[in-house]
């Protein structure tokens, strides 16, 4: 009985008949099968543990067309859960071919939405037979395959007869026309290649160390340049020099030596400093005004009966706050009841007709 796993995306709840339709298709195509279903988020977080090499087929159901990407960690988990030659199909992404191949899957030739876990290739062992037990002809005849060549060591007599100063080599007993010089040349070539590889790898490492020693941090150069005074680094041309050897304090009208830019920079720094000081002073004044206002609110002004008593300005010896009501409008306050009346003498009876109308 086949084991089938359904991985459901959380958006499956938008279509209540989608999962049932998939299960019906599985019953029609496979028949009797053991079907399990899990939410893919729970599998990714590790809340649901899946057994390795268990499922013959895993189907991913995702109705969200705009987001079908699968993390590489989930691909690896699905790969480990499938059996050999198992299939992972369904609503799979089509833009993650590299991740699919890196995980170990093979994309089906007939369907891009089907990934197959390949069966591992078994290694074939080739037995090596000892010298002297069987001849090459007997080995090839008995096994029906091409026999491996057998080698034997050259004797000292043959070396003396050949008067060769080369080291003792190996000869192939299965090949009659073996060229010993070719074998020695191949050995020397391999040794030479290995020596070249070692030399160049050592030289590359030394070059890397030298490059690291010669690297200068650019930030250090910037710090050093900032520590110097701008005026000390200024080069004044001959045309701007004063005859007595002194330097100009201000830049010329058409300055080209950089003194004008330095002055503008210093002026900008001074202006920013003044703005910051004025801003702090304004802020402190605002805070002080707020404190005074709060203090006045906590201590309201109260008038006594003496302050609220009415004063008769017609009686001699009694005056108002200004004491000039009898002199005329030019000497009267804004709220004086005698505004608009001619001047009068202290003690003179004054009638105010406008008050009667108001009453």
From Swiss-Prot:
Binding site residues for [2Fe-2S] cluster: 240, 252, 255, 257
Gene3D superfamilies cross-referenced by the UniProt entry: Fe-S cluster assembly protein Dre2, N-terminal domain (3.40.50.11000)
Ligand binding ([4Fe-4S] cluster): 322, 325, 333, 336
GO cellular component terms, semicolon-separated: cytosolic [4Fe-4S] assembly targeting complex; mitochondrial intermembrane space
Short name of any one Pfam family annotated for the protein: CIAPIN1
Residue stretches of biased makeup (Low complexity): 155-166
Motif Cx2C motif 2: positions: 333-336
Keywords: 2Fe-2S, 4Fe-4S, Cytoplasm, Iron, Iron-sulfur, Metal-binding, Mitochondrion
Subcellular location(s) per record: Cytoplasm; Mitochondrion intermembrane space
Motif Cx2C motif 1, chain ranges: 322-325
Segments passing through the bilayer: none
Domain of life: Eukaryota
Keyword Transmembrane helix recorded: no
Record keyword Iron-sulfur present: yes
Composition skew (Polar residues), residue ranges: 167-177
Region (N-terminal SAM-like domain): 1-159
Annotated GO MF terms: 2 iron, 2 sulfur cluster binding; 4 iron, 4 sulfur cluster binding; electron transfer activity; metal ion binding
Cofactor(s), names only, from the UniProt record: [2Fe-2S] cluster; [4Fe-4S] cluster
Annotated region described as Fe-S binding site A, given as residue ranges: 240-257
Region (Fe-S binding site B): 322-336
UniProt function note: Component of the cytosolic iron-sulfur (Fe-S) protein assembly (CIA) machinery required for the maturation of extramitochondrial Fe-S proteins. Part of an electron transfer chain functioning in an early step of cytosolic Fe-S biogenesis, facilitating the de novo assembly of a [4Fe-4S] cluster on the scaffold complex CFD1-NBP35. Electrons are transferred to DRE2 from NADPH via the FAD- and FMN-containing protein TAH18.
Protein name: Fe-S cluster assembly protein DRE2
Organism of derivation: Scheffersomyces stipitis (strain ATCC 58785 / CBS 6054 / NBRC 10063 / NRRL Y-11545) (Yeast)
């Amino acid at each position: 009985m086949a084991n089938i796993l359904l991985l459901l995306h959380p958006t499956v709840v938008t279509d209540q008949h989608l999962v049932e339709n998939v299960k019906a298709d599985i019953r029609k195509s496979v028949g009797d099968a053991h079907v399990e279903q899990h939410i893919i988020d729970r599998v990714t977080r590790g809340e649901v543990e899946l057994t390795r090499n268990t499922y013959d087929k895993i189907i991913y159901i995702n109705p969200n067309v705009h987001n079908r990407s699968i993390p590489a960690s989930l691909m690896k988990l699905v790969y480990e859960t499938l059996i050999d030659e198992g299939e992972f199909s369904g609503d799979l992404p089509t833009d993650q071919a590299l991740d699919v191949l890196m995980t170990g899957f093979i994309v089906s030739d007939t369907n891009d939405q089907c990934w197959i876990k390949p069966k591992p290739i078994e290694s074939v062992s080739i037995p090596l037979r000892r010298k002297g037990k069987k001849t090459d002809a007997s080995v090839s005849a008995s096994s029906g395959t091409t026999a491996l060549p057998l080698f034997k060591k050259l004797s000292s007599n043959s070396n003396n007869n050949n008067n060769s100063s080369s080291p003792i080599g190996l000869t192939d007993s299965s090949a009659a026309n073996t060229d010993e010089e070719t074998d020695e040349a191949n050995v020397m070539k391999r040794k030479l290649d290995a020596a070249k590889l070692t030399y160049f790898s050592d030289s590359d490492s030394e070059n890397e160390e030298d490059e690291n020693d010669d690297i200068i941090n650019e930030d250090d150069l910037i710090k050093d340049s900032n520590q110097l005074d701008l005026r000390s680094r200024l080069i004044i041309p001959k045309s701007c020099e004063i005859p007595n050897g002194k330097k100009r304090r201000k830049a010329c009208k058409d300055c080209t030596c950089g003194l004008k830019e330095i002055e503008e920079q210093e002026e900008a720094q001074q202006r920013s400093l003044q703005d910051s000081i004025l801003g702090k002073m304004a802020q402190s004044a605002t805070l002080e005004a707020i404190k005074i206002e709060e203090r006045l609110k906590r201590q309201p002004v109260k008038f006594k009966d003496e302050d609220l008593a009415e004063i008769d300005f017609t009686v001699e010896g009694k005056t108002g706050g200004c004491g000039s009501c009898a002199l005329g409008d030019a000497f009267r306050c804004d709220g004086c009841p005698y505004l608009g009346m001619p001047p009068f003498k202290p003690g003179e009876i004054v009638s105010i007709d406008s008050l009667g109308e108001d009453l």
